Each structure stands twice: as structure tokens, then as C-alpha cells.
Amino acid sequence: LWDQCSWIIETVSEKLELKQAIFKHLDESVPTTIPIGSNSSGFPISKIALGLKTAQRMMGAHYFMPAEVVPLVEIVLGEKTDPAIAQQVCQLYREVNKKPVLVKKDIPGFLANRIQHALMREALSLVEEGIASPEDIDDAVRYSFGFRYAAVGPMTQKEISGWDGMANAAKEI
């Protein structure tokens, strides 16, 4: 049974006790050479794997919906996750045309959701302050940097346009 298995991922509903029970069972029954992941959207992997004997092989593996279309998978290191095992899992995802990103600390919201929520907080603030309509905010994102970010991320874009210019503009914003 386990000879053909290179990775296990849990995808049950967001109930911490359920995830912990499944991880406890996997910890006890799955060969220690097989990494185990959780697709949790919010629970830290360190909480899910708390007290387990083989927590070094456990990590978050957060997909984005629809998972069959969106290539990103966040690989989230828990407090005890072995980074070398996480790199092996990243390679498995690359082999199936997914784009893994390594989140080196087990923080709430992981990486992409934190960036998304920062944008949403500012968008809601602009609507609440009467600066723009929701439709205009959507258009501002869709027809400017949203379109551009599909080609290059924010860090690469600033590298291209110049960090000094961004720093000067940020003083005014």
C-alpha cells in the first residue's frame, strides 16, 4: 500500500479537533518516510501536529480555489517541520505543474491570504471614506496592477521600476 505513496494531504473541513485526530492516526500508521500535509486555510500546522512523534514531516499545504486551475500551493513550515522534507514536497508539486512557495514561519493567514487581506482592507477603507465606488476600485485593480501582477509579482515589479522611486512615492501615501 505505502510503496506507491510519496505524500499524504488531509483536506477535511476546518475543525481543529478533526484535523488533530486525523494527524494522530497518520502519525501512528503511516511510514515515517512519507511527508504529511494539511490543506488548512487557517489553523497553524504546529497546532494540528502538536505533540505528535513525527511532527518534523508535517507541514501545511494550502491550495487556492479552484485548485485545479490556480497553480499556487503554499508549503507552510511548522515549528518542528524539517525544511529538507518541505523542499522534497515542493519538488513533488513542481512535477505536477503546481507552483509551490515556501512559507518559512507558521503565521496566521500564511502568505498569499495576508497579501490579499491587506489589499482588501485598503479597498474597503477607500469605499468607507467615499473616495471611490466598489466598481471603480475593482476596475483600478483589474486594469492596472492586477493585470500586471499576473506577469510579475510586486517585488519583481519594484525591482524593474526602481526601489528609490517607490520609497519616495511611499512617503506621500
Q: Across the structure, where does each feature detected by a protein language model lie?
A:
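Rossmann-fold dinucleotide-binding core
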Residues: 35-113
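Short acidic capping loops at alpha-helix termini that bridge into adjacent secondary structure
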Residues: 4, 32-34, 55-57, 135-136
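Rossmann-like NAD(P)-binding element
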Residues: 1-35, 43
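Helical "substrate-binding/catalytic lid" subdomain
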Residues: 106-173
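N-terminal alpha-helical segment
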Residues: 19, 68-72, 119-120
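Short beta-strands and strand-loop turn motifs
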Residues: 9-10, 70, 102-104, 151-153
